[in-house]
From Swiss-Prot:
One of its GO terms (biological process) is RNA polymerase II core complex assembly. Binds specifically to cytosolic chaperonin (c-CPN) and transfers target proteins to it. Binds to nascent polypeptide chain and promotes folding in an environment in which there are many competing pathways for nonnative proteins. One of its GO terms (molecular function) is unfolded protein binding. This is Probable prefoldin subunit 5. Coiled coil: none annotated. GO terms for cellular component: cytoplasm; prefoldin complex. It holds the Pfam family Prefoldin. Transmembrane segments: none annotated. Belongs to the prefoldin subunit alpha family. The gene is pfdn5.
């Protein structure tokens, strides 16, 4: 997958209105990326919980348990075999694995997600730096505008 091409814009050449629009766009992108990080962390936590649950299966043959039908409805059940688990590998596909294989799968997923979180965090940091630059340019333009207004006011007073 190719990265989107970054466009370099001379912030000094933009008007205050354009700077405001760019600032709002960058803030929205930061918000979107932050939400992505939260979703990735949520997914990572699910894999961590799954790994821990698989670890808790050892020595549970014949034990009674509750089997979830939905997030709020459970049926009583009994563990017949605790040597194999069904692992959701994505898009509705499940693979039967040994507990250790399932835990390794979860570890790999957590590692992959952590790498993605780091990449997204790097992008957020870059966007924040861009946002700081935009705000600084806007503030300097506002200061310059105020100076010009003050000079014009002084000139008008002197002409009278």
């Amino acid at each position: 997958m190719s990265e989107p091409q970054q466009q370099q814009v001379n912030l000094g050449s933009l008007s205050l209105e354009q700077l405001q629009m760019v600032r709002e766009q960058v803030e929205a992108e930061i918000q979107q990326l932050s939400e992505s990080i939260q979703q990735l962390k949520h997914a990572s936590n699910k894999y961590i919980e799954a790994k821990e649950a698989m670890g808790g299966l050892k020595g549970t043959d014949g034990k009674d348990m509750l089997v979830p039908l939905t997030s709020s409805i459970y049926l009583p059940g009994k563990i017949n075999s605790n040597e194999k688990v069904l692992v959701d590998i994505g898009t509705g596909y499940y693979v039967e694995m040994g507990i250790e294989q399932g835990q390794n799968f979860s570890n790999r997923k957590v590692q992959l997600i952590t790498e993605q979180v780091n990449k997204v965090q790097t992008a957020i940091n870059m966007k924040r730096q861009n946002l700081e630059s935009i705000v600084q340019v806007a503030q300097s333009k506002i200061s310059l505008y105020k100076q010009q207004q003050a000079q014009q006011s002084q000139q008008q007073v002197q002409q009278k």
